[in-house]
Amino acid sequence: SVLELGKMILQETGKNAITSYGSYGCNCGWGHRGQPKDATDRCCFVHKCCYKKLTDCNHKTDRYSYSWKNKAIICEEKNPCLKEMCECDKAVAICLRENLDTYNKKYKAYFKLKCKKPDTC
Protein backbone atom coordinates (compact mmCIF):
# COMPACT_ATOMS: atom_id res chain seq x y z
CA SER A 1 0.00 0.00 0.00
CA VAL A 2 0.94 3.64 -0.05
CA LEU A 3 2.05 3.33 3.60
CA GLU A 4 4.70 0.69 2.92
CA LEU A 5 5.90 2.53 -0.17
CA GLY A 6 6.32 5.75 1.80
CA LYS A 7 8.26 3.96 4.52
CA MET A 8 10.57 2.31 1.99
CA ILE A 9 11.29 5.62 0.25
CA LEU A 10 12.08 7.29 3.58
CA GLN A 11 14.37 4.41 4.59
CA GLU A 12 16.25 4.39 1.27
CA THR A 13 16.45 8.12 0.50
CA GLY A 14 15.90 9.92 3.79
CA LYS A 15 13.19 11.95 2.00
CA ASN A 16 9.49 12.15 2.77
CA ALA A 17 7.67 10.42 -0.09
CA ILE A 18 4.71 12.79 -0.14
CA THR A 19 6.53 16.12 0.12
CA SER A 20 9.54 15.16 -2.03
CA TYR A 21 8.00 12.86 -4.65
CA GLY A 22 4.21 13.32 -4.40
CA SER A 23 4.02 15.55 -7.47
CA TYR A 24 7.53 15.26 -8.87
CA GLY A 25 7.93 15.37 -12.65
CA CYS A 26 5.45 13.64 -14.93
CA ASN A 27 5.31 10.24 -13.22
CA CYS A 28 5.71 10.50 -9.46
CA GLY A 29 2.54 10.59 -7.38
CA TRP A 30 -1.03 9.91 -8.41
CA GLY A 31 -2.39 10.04 -11.88
CA HIS A 32 -0.53 11.05 -14.99
CA ARG A 33 2.22 9.33 -16.89
CA GLY A 34 4.39 11.16 -19.36
CA GLN A 35 7.87 11.26 -20.79
CA PRO A 36 10.18 11.31 -17.76
CA LYS A 37 11.86 14.65 -17.05
CA ASP A 38 15.00 13.07 -15.52
CA ALA A 39 16.33 9.84 -13.96
CA THR A 40 14.32 10.38 -10.76
CA ASP A 41 11.11 10.75 -12.77
CA ARG A 42 12.05 7.65 -14.79
CA CYS A 43 12.15 5.64 -11.54
CA CYS A 44 8.50 6.56 -11.01
CA PHE A 45 7.62 5.75 -14.63
CA VAL A 46 9.12 2.26 -14.30
CA HIS A 47 7.29 1.86 -10.97
CA LYS A 48 3.93 2.64 -12.59
CA CYS A 49 4.70 0.10 -15.31
CA CYS A 50 5.52 -2.46 -12.62
CA TYR A 51 2.16 -1.79 -10.95
CA LYS A 52 0.36 -2.29 -14.28
CA LYS A 53 1.43 -5.95 -14.18
CA LEU A 54 -0.32 -6.54 -10.84
CA THR A 55 -3.64 -8.24 -11.45
CA ASP A 56 -4.82 -9.73 -8.16
CA CYS A 57 -4.12 -6.94 -5.69
CA ASN A 58 -4.69 -3.21 -5.26
CA HIS A 59 -1.51 -1.16 -4.89
CA LYS A 60 -3.36 1.70 -3.21
CA THR A 61 -4.99 -0.26 -0.39
CA ASP A 62 -3.60 -3.80 -0.04
CA ARG A 63 -0.91 -4.15 2.61
CA TYR A 64 2.12 -6.43 2.54
CA SER A 65 4.87 -7.25 5.00
CA TYR A 66 8.55 -6.50 4.59
CA SER A 67 11.48 -5.99 6.89
CA TRP A 68 14.45 -3.64 7.00
CA LYS A 69 17.61 -5.56 7.88
CA ASN A 70 21.16 -4.22 7.59
CA LYS A 71 19.86 -1.29 5.52
CA ALA A 72 18.17 -3.65 3.05
CA ILE A 73 14.49 -4.12 2.22
CA ILE A 74 13.38 -7.75 2.39
CA CYS A 75 9.97 -8.64 0.95
CA GLU A 76 8.58 -11.38 3.18
CA GLU A 77 5.11 -11.71 1.70
CA LYS A 78 3.75 -15.18 0.89
CA ASN A 79 0.91 -13.98 -1.36
CA PRO A 80 2.39 -13.84 -4.91
CA CYS A 81 0.69 -10.59 -5.96
CA LEU A 82 1.54 -8.81 -2.70
CA LYS A 83 5.14 -10.05 -2.96
CA GLU A 84 5.34 -8.63 -6.49
CA MET A 85 3.90 -5.31 -5.27
CA CYS A 86 6.52 -5.25 -2.52
CA GLU A 87 9.25 -5.89 -5.11
CA CYS A 88 7.90 -3.01 -7.27
CA ASP A 89 8.04 -0.68 -4.27
CA LYS A 90 11.48 -1.91 -3.24
CA ALA A 91 12.80 -1.29 -6.78
CA VAL A 92 11.51 2.29 -6.94
CA ALA A 93 12.85 3.13 -3.47
CA ILE A 94 16.31 1.85 -4.45
CA CYS A 95 16.11 3.62 -7.83
CA LEU A 96 15.24 6.92 -6.15
CA ARG A 97 18.19 6.52 -3.76
CA GLU A 98 20.55 5.70 -6.63
CA ASN A 99 19.38 8.82 -8.48
CA LEU A 100 19.30 11.32 -5.61
CA ASP A 101 21.91 13.36 -7.49
CA THR A 102 19.42 13.94 -10.34
CA TYR A 103 16.68 15.23 -8.02
CA ASN A 104 15.80 18.70 -9.30
CA LYS A 105 13.62 21.03 -7.22
CA LYS A 106 12.16 22.56 -10.39
CA TYR A 107 10.29 19.27 -10.96
CA LYS A 108 9.08 18.94 -7.35
CA ALA A 109 5.61 20.38 -8.03
CA TYR A 110 5.63 19.99 -11.79
CA PHE A 111 2.56 21.08 -13.76
CA LYS A 112 1.45 17.73 -15.20
CA LEU A 113 -0.34 19.23 -18.20
CA LYS A 114 3.10 20.14 -19.57
CA CYS A 115 3.97 16.43 -19.79
CA LYS A 116 4.30 14.91 -23.24
CA LYS A 117 2.74 11.60 -24.22
CA PRO A 118 4.34 8.79 -22.22
CA ASP A 119 6.64 6.11 -23.43
CA THR A 120 5.04 2.69 -23.46
CA CYS A 121 5.93 0.32 -20.65
From Swiss-Prot:
Tell me the PROSITE patterns matching this sequence: PA2_ASP, PA2_HIS
Report keywords, A-Z. Answer: Disulfide bond, Myotoxin, Secreted, Toxin
- Quick one: where is this thing mainly located? secreted
Q: What superkingdom heads the lineage?
A: Eukaryota
Q: Where is this region: Important for membrane-damaging activities in eukaryotes and bacteria?
A: 105-117
Q: Which InterPro entries match?
A: PLipase_A2 (IPR001211), PLipase_A2_Asp_AS (IPR033112), PLipase_A2_dom (IPR016090), PLipase_A2_dom_sf (IPR036444), PLipase_A2_His_AS (IPR033113)
Asked if Secreted is a keyword of the record, the answer is yes
Q: Where in the cell is it found?
A: Secreted
Gene Ontology cellular-component terms for this entry are: extracellular region
User: Which organs or tissues contain this protein?
Assistant: Expressed by the venom gland.
The molecular function terms in GO held by this entry are: calcium ion binding; calcium-dependent phospholipase A2 activity; phospholipid binding; toxin activity
The family assignment reads: Belongs to the phospholipase A2 family. Group II subfamily. K49 sub-subfamily.
Protein name per the record: Basic phospholipase A2 homolog AppP2
